Amino acid sequence: MPDLGDLLEARTRRPDAIAAAAAARKRPTSLFGEHGKLMIIAADHPARGALRAGADPLAMANRVELLDRIRSALARPGVNGVLGTPDILEDLLLLGELDDKVVIGSMNRGGLAGTTFEIDDRFTAFDAHSIALAGYEGGKMLLRIDPDDPGTVATLESCGNAVSQLASRRVMAMVEPFISHRVDGRVRNDLTTEAMIRAMTVAAGLGTTSAYTWLKVPIVSEMDRVMAATTLPALILGGEGEAAYAEWRKALELPTVQGLVIGRSLLYPAQGTVADAVDRAVSLL
């Protein structure tokens, strides 16, 4: 378990230690692991107030426990990256866990889960400048397109600007697109084949160049049709339960799919340990 005292000592008495750790971090020589793919652990959910894993609405609420689970995942062979907000990535920096890892900074966390302004997803975490300054390998943004919510256009514009700014610094711009609707007052992502095709084509066209754009997409039906919508490289996200592994395996056979970005289903597996869940996911690569 990470030592909370050590983290607090650095944060209260030596805050410059964070920048020093980022500068000293050994960067990966490639985005890809020895398996030729990307295997990224996603841990940016808490900043949106999304703490649920499985049936526990506050599963991710204990930060030291979450860090311990992330460390366990990052230590497994074949895991070569992590996605997080500044607070989590800086804890991992102080713990010395980010050497040789592909580090992706999460950017727009302003669309807090369950709020009236959820679709107007402001860039409240990393920006392109801070990602480049820290020496990280990319930035990730969530793009939810709700035809009935005027906040969508602000998010579209912000994501387009972020793609351009990341590309100008030659780092990955990871876009996670959805068509979304409010159902009984809550935002729900449309996971039909047609909706994902439309979302991907919109995301692929963001920014002044797509040279550094990657897409982060969920498993839906007819993934071959979905992935045929663009030539951009893609990473598969999410999924829960036993069926997820079979779905990931099938998706990884598609030519544009370059790996996995998985969070809660590996960090809080329904059965077994974090190591067991991660090793099984890595075996698919």
Region locations from a protein language model:
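N-terminal amphipathic alpha-helix/helix-capping segment at the start of soluble metabolic enzymes
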Residues: 1-44, 49, 92-100
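Structured core elements
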Residues: 40-42, 216, 261
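Alpha/beta enzyme core
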Residues: 47, 53-77, 81, 89, ...
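Short conserved micro-motifs at the rims of enzyme active sites and ligand-binding pockets
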Residues: 51-54, 271-273
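N-terminal glycine-rich phosphate/pyrophosphate-binding loops that anchor nucleotide-derived ligands
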Residues: 85
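Thr-Gly-centered strand-to-loop micro-motif
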Residues: 236-238, 262
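Short acidic/histidine-rich active-site segments
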Residues: 259-267
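C-terminal helical cap(s) of enzyme catalytic domains, especially alpha/beta-barrels
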Residues: 267-285
